[in-house]
Each structure stands twice: as structure tokens, then as C-alpha cells.
Amino acid sequence: MRTVGVEEELLLVDPATGEPRALSAAVLARAFLDDSEQDVFEKELHEQMLEFATHPQADMERLHAEIVRCREEAGRHAGGIGCAVAALATSPLPVTPSIGVNRRYEWMAEQYGVVVHEQLVLGCHVHVSVDSDEEGVAVIDRVRPWLPVLAALSANSPFWQGRDSSYSSYRSRVWQRWPSAGPTELFGSAERYHRRVADMLATGTVLDDGMVYFDVRLSQRYPTVEFRVADVCLDASTAVVLAALARALVDTAAREWRAGAEPAEHSVSLLRLAAWRAARSGLTSELLHPATMRRMPAESVVRDLLEHAGEALAAAGDLERVREGVEKLLRHGNGARVQRELLARTGSLREVVAACVRRTQAA
């Protein structure tokens, strides 16, 4: 069975005011003092964020337990220096981000200017194991039209600089400012994929292959394909639903490839429109259907995703968990809806952050 690993980026906030705190270096130092052998947590581009990565897991129950544990540990380390962690993909409250200190980040700031300074956005990346680069590229070609559906399920960033953005995932719109970000055309082979990356690097526009920010890509460090479209999810259980769906999409795509089925030839222009619509309305309105690229109710598109990936979900033993998780999202809403409902109820973005801090730590 394919293994799955999850990387989550968490926002460091003041527990009293809800404002982001530039304390990632101090939190990492605290984590090292508590456990000198820990290698779970890493710094990121901005000092108001902290990243962790799980181990590869084949069992979704174990993956869920590890995500919960990592969130709890992050909260404990942050609490030791007077801040808290929140699984929020953007800060609801206004913030002036602080860029971390290292040569890579300095190069990025000089090269991209305000794009870097405004990139305090937090995502969830899912790694799914593949047998080879050839299989991985075949998967990338075949999962492309389904990625906006995953983005809609995860959407958790309605607020930007203290106001409602009108988007469910404004994080994804900010992320698209990077020159290498977004959907890709069909590659057709691993050789063409690697040639395309080499051509991009040869322009000098991106620093290295780590900055090739395709929506789904071959990992530079692991034998995996890496899904990069999701907001960090408010609930750990939603992150596991995304991970299980990503694995099922990989299994389904690999099976289609081995059977000789050709991938859908949707243009990058249409895929960008599908991604925009998912970011704009999440699960509240319509999405572009992956088969037709025409508008359909979001609930219908999500149910078609379950049907498309259902055989693989059942084979992995994940079907019931994913069905229940998806029904919960359709019934009660994704993180974006939860945040808006919190604001409507409390009238305070500070209270929104406080509630999300508590929810981040919940099992």
C-alpha cells in the first residue's frame, strides 16, 4: 500500500490578541531544548509560521494520531514562550510579515520584492509514494482536473489583513503570485517533466528546483508526488480526509496509466479558471466539473470525486472515513465557513483566532 506523509504550516499568534508573532526561531529553540533529537519542526519563509512533517504512514488512523500529536507538541513549544499555534491559512488580523534570516530567503526577497513580503500564507502538502518518476508523472498528468476539488474542501483563508477577502481560499490567490506556481500542461513522460524543470531553472527566474511550485510535482527529497493545492486545514481530521483522497487519486491515476487510458487534455487556462472558482466559493456554490470544465453544484462535484476515487478508497480501507469526513464538510462547512460563522457570532476577529487556536489542538 502506498504511504502518505503530510506537511502542515501553522500560524504563531499572541494568545491574548490573536495577532501573529514573529517567534519561529524561539519556538524551534524551545523544541530543541525539550527534545534535542527532534527533527519534526522547521522554520519557514516568515517568522510568524512553523512547519511540521509527519512520517510516511500507510494507515490513516496512525496519520491522524501523528498530526494531532505534532499539533499538540507545536502548541506546547509555542506556549513555553508565550504564544500559540493556529491552523489558519491566512491571518485574520492585520500583520506585517517578518522574513526569516538566511541567504535563500534574502535572495527571494531581493528577486521577488513585495510578493515575498506578503507571502504569509499557510498550506498543507500531501506526499504520496510512487514506484518511479515515470509513474509519478503519469499520475501528475491524470490528477490535474481534480486538484481544485481538493482545494475547495480544504479552503480555510477567508480573511486578509483584517477584512473579508470574499474568497474561501485567499491563500491560494496570494500563492499564485509566484512565477512558477499553478497548474501544468500535460508532460507525457518523466523525461519531458525533467526537461521542463531544467528549462525553467535555466532562465534564472527561480533559484532551484525547490522553487518549482507546480500544484502537484515530483518531490525533490522523497520518492513521492507532492500535492500542494490545499490550505492548512482547521481540523486534523480534514487533513486526513485530504491525504486519503490524494492517495486514492494517485492509485486511480496509476491504474488508468497502466491500462493505457489517456489523461484529460484540459488546457492550463481552463485549469486556472477551475482553481479560481474553487478559491472563490469553496463548497458554497459551484465548481468546474473535472470531466467537462462546466459549472456544477459543488456538492455534486465532490460526490463525483468520491465515485471517481471510490474503488481505491475502498481497497485502502478509507472509504467510510472519507465519506463521513466529506459529509461533515458539506453539512457544516470547511474552515472558511467556520471562520465566517465565528465572526458573525462574536463580532471579533480576535475571538475567531482564539476559537481556531482551541480547534487546532482538538483531536
Swiss-Prot record:
Enzymatic reactions: L-cysteine + L-glutamate + ATP = gamma-L-glutamyl-L-cysteine + ADP + phosphate + H(+)
Function noted in UniProt: ATP-dependent carboxylate-amine ligase which exhibits weak glutamate--cysteine ligase activity.
A Pfam family it matches: GCS2
Organism the protein comes from: Streptomyces coelicolor (strain ATCC BAA-471 / A3(2) / M145)
Protein name per its UniProtKB record: Putative glutamate--cysteine ligase 2
Keywords: ATP-binding, Ligase, Nucleotide-binding
Enzyme Commission number: 6.3.2.2
BP-aspect Gene Ontology terms: modified amino acid biosynthetic process
Sequence similarity: Belongs to the glutamate--cysteine ligase type 2 family. YbdK subfamily.
Gene3D superfamilies: 3.30.590.20
GO MF, one annotated term: ATP binding
Classification via HAMAP family: Glu_cys_ligase_2 (MF_01609)
